[in-house]
Amino acid sequence: IKVIHKCTSARHSLKAQSIGCDAVSVDGFECGGHPGEDDIPNFILLPRAADELEIPFVASGGMADARSLVAAMALGAEGMNMGTRFIATQDAPVHQNVKEAIVGASELDTRLIMRSLTNTERVMNNDAVERLMEKEKALGDQLTFADIVDEVAGVYPKIMHEGTMDAGAWSCGMVAGLVNDIPTVKELIDTIMDEADAIISKRLSNF
């Protein structure tokens, strides 16, 4: 069994290496879900990981296409990991409403929630997220998980399976702004590899 540990900082990546992980997924601030508490984007985080690590790592957060792959490898990663982009594929076992929400979103449509709980999550903005943020604003440091349980607990089946998009907060990366279609996984991967080869052999051939 190979273990790839998600890490959101260079220091966490080093810890994963020290306890025997085979590789790490280095997640920048752009990522959907939990980006950690350091707010370091991948243009800084990936080279930092490359400077520190001896084990291989893949880049996560903001990854969507051939440009992402080539850039990630230039910054030291062995490849890239995609979350939000893969959700918006025909093969993803989620409701069509979720896929269309990602395609219809821009890079401005995510929000960071639960920062005061030191459990920061990047989510797609919707009515439930707006309610949650109003609670955060009103309660400040007094906010507890119990105050927002209706917006975050048990909501994924309603969203991902039933397509009730305002049922609660759901993870989505800023990369939604780069997602414009819903291909099959094979089509997506084939396109990424073909376009990455073209970038390297043509656009970058003179460097």
Pin down the residues of each PLM region.
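Glycine-enriched alpha-helix->loop->beta-strand junction motifs that scaffold or abut catalytic
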Residues: I1-V3, S18-S25, F29, E52-I55, ...
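Conserved active-site-proximal phosphate/metal-binding subdomains
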Residues: G36-V58, M63-F207
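Glycine/Thr-rich beta-alpha phosphate-binding loop at enzyme active sites
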Residues: K6-L46, T89, P93-H95
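Active-site glycine- and acidic-residue-rich loops that bind
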Residues: I1-T8, L132
